[in-house]
Amino acid sequence: MINDSLIILAAGLSSRMKKSVSNNNLSKNSIEQANNTEKGLISIDKNGRPLIHYLLLNAKSAGFKTIYLVIGQKSKSFKNYFNKNIYDGLDIKFAIQYFDKNRVKPSGTADALYQTITQFPVLKSLNFCVCNSDNLYSSKALNSVRSTSFLNAFISYDRDYLNFSTEKVNSFSILKLNKNGYLEDILEKPTAKDYEFFKDKNGKIRVNMNLFKFNGSVFFEYLKNCPFDKLRNEKELPTAVLNLVKNQPNSVYGIPFEEHVPDLTSKNDI
């Protein structure tokens, strides 16, 4: 089955970015963008082009043709950007993540993906990929996850290649893969003792940077029935993935990758 659809998650409120304090002598303009602009639209080069620009170029180079951009129910910035910027060869569609008036924020990444599929039901019968809007994945990584023959898969990054501070790297959840490379578990906030038990067959610690491929007919029900995380009060994509793995072992393959992934989580990342 051809896989040329990429869903980009961009409906978060960027809370960590707005709350963070910069140690990098950012310009007044950069700080203003960080406090007021969706992360994917923050300028990252001298010409003012945002991260989403380069992510879309890499996606096109990787063979994607249809982009589903998931934005918040009040978001206007992305629509304004794409009214002024055309990406030939890419069909860009908008999905809206709505949330109940009793909530102060969206219901999480699993809910964002669920709402996207309900708004575009064709995705139920397709293979598609999913990624964050605030990570700049390489065209090589995007092509690898797009073209894999596994129904459900993700890029399994070698932690040693991520060029972040030790504090930031240690904050990433780590993955447990079986000897054949299939996902068995995801551990958030690991301790030093956990690392030894989560090494893969080559002795590597693997982390997930939210670059996935899913089969819609397989994964939709797990999104629909994803529970809220008790601490964060959100429906999180890794929870839905783990529920799939528990029900169907050897169903989600980790594609090993060794490279850095530029990331915009806090002001220090700009």
Question: Where do the language-model regions lie?
Answer:
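Conserved N-terminal catalytic core of the sugar/cofactor nucleotidyltransferase
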Residues: 1-5, 14-33, 45-127
